[in-house]
């Protein structure tokens, strides 16, 4: 595999994972407030 492909897959995975994480974080903060 090329380094570019690995980098793109890593960035894509980070975006896919960070989406729900940010939503969950906001939900938890609102719940605590």
Curated annotation (Swiss-Prot):
<comment type="subunit">
    <text>PSII is composed of 1 copy each of membrane proteins PsbA, PsbB, PsbC, PsbD, PsbE, PsbF, PsbH, PsbI, PsbJ, PsbK, PsbL, PsbM, PsbT, PsbX, PsbY, PsbZ, Psb30/Ycf12, peripheral proteins of the oxygen-evolving complex and a large number of cofactors. It forms dimeric complexes.</text>
</comment>
<feature type="transmembrane region" description="Helical">
    <location>
        <begin position="5"/>
        <end position="25"/>
    </location>
</feature>
<keyword id="KW-0472">Membrane</keyword>
<keyword id="KW-1133">Transmembrane helix</keyword>
<comment type="similarity">
    <text>Belongs to the Psb30/Ycf12 family.</text>
</comment>
<keyword id="KW-0602">Photosynthesis</keyword>
<dbReference type="GO" id="GO:0009523">
    <property type="term" value="C:photosystem II"/>
</dbReference>
<dbReference type="InterPro" id="IPR010284">
    <property type="entry name" value="PSII_Ycf12_core-subunit"/>
</dbReference>
<protein>
    <recommendedName>
        <fullName>Photosystem II reaction center protein Psb30</fullName>
    </recommendedName>
</protein>
<dbReference type="GO" id="GO:0015979">
    <property type="term" value="P:photosynthesis"/>
</dbReference>
<keyword id="KW-0812">Transmembrane</keyword>
<comment type="function">
    <text>A core subunit of photosystem II (PSII), probably helps stabilize the reaction center.</text>
</comment>
<keyword id="KW-0604">Photosystem II</keyword>
<keyword id="KW-0793">Thylakoid</keyword>
<dbReference type="GO" id="GO:0009535">
    <property type="term" value="C:chloroplast thylakoid membrane"/>
</dbReference>
<keyword id="KW-0934">Plastid</keyword>
<dbReference type="Pfam" id="PF05969">
    <property type="entry name" value="PSII_Ycf12"/>
</dbReference>
<keyword id="KW-0150">Chloroplast</keyword>
């Amino acid at each position: 595999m090329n380094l570019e492909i690995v980098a793109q897959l890593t960035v894509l995975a980070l975006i896919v994972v960070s989406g729900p994480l940010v939503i969950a974080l906001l939900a938890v903060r609102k719940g605590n407030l």
